[in-house]
Regions:
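Metal-dependent active-site segment of extracytoplasmic phospho-/sulfohydrolases and closely related
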Residues: 171, 175-202
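Feature for exported/extracytoplasmic and membrane-associated proteins, marking the mature portion
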Residues: 1-180, 212-215, 219, 224-286
């Protein structure tokens, strides 16, 4: 399912501020002290996973969450890990943290992966193994870069085509590796802003406003493009340069939480306190 002409209520073109607003689920940067997925976990009581070396902002907060990423080429041997655990017996906090890390490592079971060969497909294989474990996380977040195509963007080939192909292969990998869990999974691909309608002088595009949001999953009512299309004529563009947003990305995210995780209106207000009046997008799931 694809939603087009989607944007945020915050219309700055700064990567940093726009990413903060998107991950906080707020209306301005640093307005909240937690991420909207973490507030979701506080509502559901589940556990979250950041596929990163440290917690992504979207999962930061009081809700239970942990971090995981594929191991580097020179991972510690089990015998060394056991020795370190013995050394830390006198420090319960450190010993508990290490034991938790080893538990996550064992669940992922991708320990032979080298840093050099770490593709998004390999990362998603490990992520899927964690998600399909019964006692594993309920929610996961992954940050994919490479979309800031100020130069040599290309069309059917080039930088943009490569990152889209990688995303496509990654989603296909996730679907395969999740197995039957895919039927109860929703994957949301969102971005902080789009690109300019016209190319720049370097064969790329600059920071824009509206873009597209993709939803995948076994229960998604797929095969549809949903948009209140604003047009691409000069007088239709936002500030004369960007695709104009006609749908708030938070409405789509609210719809996912409402239909997939069955959050009520008061709970949605707790997750997105700055967007209480925004109605959720409906009829996302079959």
């Amino acid at each position: 399912m694809l939603f087009h002409a989607v944007g945020q209520s915050y219309r700055d073109r700064s990567h940093f501020d726009s990413q903060v607003v998107l991950e906080e689920g707020s209306s301005r940067p640093h307005a909240l002290k937690s991420g909207w997925l973490n507030r979701t976990l506080q509502t559901t009581g589940g556990e979250g996973l950041s596929v990163s070396s440290e917690a992504l902002l979207i999962l930061q907060g009081a809700g239970r969450h942990f971090n995981w990423q594929p191991e580097p080429k020179f991972a510690a041997k089990p015998s060394f890990q056991s020795q370190v655990l013995e050394m830390l017996e006198g420090d319960p906090a450190l010993a508990t943290a290490l034991a938790e890390g080893l538990r996550v490592r064992e669940m992922a079971q991708v320990n032979s992966m080298s840093a050099k060969g770490n593709t998004i497909q390999q990362t998603l294989k490990g992520m899927a193994k964690l998600l399909r474990v019964p006692e594993g996380p309920e929610i996961a977040a992954l940050d994919l870069g490479g979309w800031d195509t100020h130069s040599r963007q290309g069309r059917e080939s080039g930088r943009f085509a490569r990152v889209f192909s990688e995303l496509s292969r990654g989603v296909a990998t996730l679907r395969t590796e999740l197995g039957s869990t895919w039927q109860d999974t929703v994957v949301a691909c969102v971005t902080e802003f789009g690109r300019t309608v016209r190319p720049n002088g370097s064969g790329g595009t600059d920071h824009g406003t509206a873009s597209a949001t993709f939803l995948f999953g076994g229960g998604i009512r797929g095969g549809r493009v949903i948009a209140d299309w604003p047009g691409l004529a000069d007088h239709d563009l936002y500030e004369g340069r960007d695709l104009r947003p006609t749908r708030d990305v938070v409405a789509v995210l609210k719809g996912v939480l409402h239909e997939h995780l069955h959050l009520t209106e008061p709970q949605l207000a707790e997750v997105f306190p700055a967007h209480r009046a925004l109605a959720p997008q409906l009829e996302i799931l079959s």
